[in-house]
A protein has these predicted regions:
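Catalytic micro-motifs at enzyme active sites that drive phosphoryl/nucleotidyl and oxygen chemistry
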Residues: 1-10, 45-50, 162-163
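DNA replication initiation modules
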Residues: 15, 20-146, 170-173, 179-180, ...
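Short, charged low-complexity linear segments at domain edges
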Residues: 138-163
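Residues in well-ordered beta-strands of folded domains
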Residues: 2-4, 19, 58-61, 154-157, ...
C-alpha cells in the first residue's frame, strides 16, 4: 500500500490518503463494504465519511511550495477482497456496515435543516401528507425498493447489497446504496419519487443547485398535481 499527503496537509493538521491495492477488481457495493471494514479495523473516526463513495476522483499528489510532503510505501501482499467481506455475517446487509459517529450526526443535522414536509402548505406538503415514505414507495417505487424484515429499512432492488435505505419518522429516507440515484441524499416522499421517476430528465442540469429549477421538479409537480389523493389534501388546505 501507499500513504501520501494531500495538498492541504500540515504537520499540525495531517491530511493523508491511504491506497490499498486489491487482488481482484470489485463491484461498487463490494468496495463500500470493504472500505468501511478496513477503516473500522484501523479507526473509522480517522477517515473522512466520503472515503467509502465508489465514484471518487483522485488527484495527482501535490504540495504547496512551503508544504511538507509525506510519502510512505507499505510492503506486503495484495489485500484479498473476499477475506474482508467474509468478516461480515452478510456483507450484502448494509445495516451491518460500520459508520463513524459523525455520520449519524450528519443525518440528524440534515433533518433539522430541512423543514418538516408535513407542515408545508403547498403542493410538496400535500404530496407528503397524502403519501408518507412507506406509502410512496408502495404506490410509486415498488419496482425500485423492497421492504426488509425491519420496518424502517428498505433495499434498493438493483443493488447486490440489502437494507441500505433508512426511513426516518416516515417523513424522510436516506439511501446508503452506492448505486442508488438517491444515494447520500435525505429525501422526503415528493423528492424520492421525483429522483427516481423523473431524475433522468435533469441530464446536464445536475449542476443546478436549486432543486426547483430542475426539469425533474417541474415534471414531479405536474405528476403530483394530477394525483387524486393529493388533490384531496390540497382541497382540505384551501378549506382550512
Amino acid at each position: 500500500g501507499i500513504i501520501y499527503s494531500t495538498h492541504k496537509h500540515k504537520p499540525e493538521a495531517p491530511r493523508l490518503r491511504l491506497v490499498i491495492p486489491l487482488s481482484r477488481s470489485v463491484m461498487a457495493e463490494e468496495y463500500v463494504a470493504i472500505a468501511r471494514k478496513v477503516a473500522e479495523e484501523i479507526d473509522i473516526e480517522m477517515f473522512d465519511d466520503t472515503t467509502y463513495e465508489p465514484n471518487r476522483l483522485m488527484y495527482w499528489p501535490s504540495t504547496s511550495k512551503d508544504g511538507v510532503y509525506v510519502y510512505r510505501e507499505l510492503h506486503g501482499d495484495l489485500l484479498n477482497p473476499d477475506s474482508v467481506l467474509a468478516r461480515y455475517k452478510n456483507w450484502h446487509d448494509v445495516s451491518e456496515y460500520p459508520v463513524s459517529s459523525r455520520q449519524t450526526k450528519i443525518v440528524q443535522h440534515m433533518m433539522q435543516k430541512q423543514k418538516d414536509p408535513l407542515t408545508k402548505n403547498n403542493l410538496i406538503g400535500a404530496f407528503c401528507q397524502a403519501y408518507d415514505i412507506p406509502s410512496a414507495i408502495g404506490s410509486f417505487l415498488n419496482e425500485v425498493y423492497e421492504p426488509t424484515a425491519s420496518p424502517d429499512r428498505y433495499s434498493y432492488i438493483p443493488a447486490d447489497s440489502v437494507a441500505g435505505v433508512v426511513v426516518y419518522e416516515n417523513k424522510f429516507m436516506y439511501s446508503h446504496h452506492a448505486t442508488d440515484p438517491a444515494s447520500g441524499m435525505l429525501l422526503n416522499s415528493f423528492d424520492a419519487v421525483r429522483v427516481h421517476r423523473f431524475g433522468n430528465l435533469d441530464g446536464e442540469s445536475v449542476t443546478v443547485t436549486e432543486t426547483t429549477k430542475l426539469p425533474s421538479y417541474k415534471a414531479m409537480c405536474e405528476f403530483a398535481a394530477a394525483d387524486g389523493e393529493v388533490k384531496k389534501v390540497l382541497l382540505q388546505m384551501r378549506e382550512a
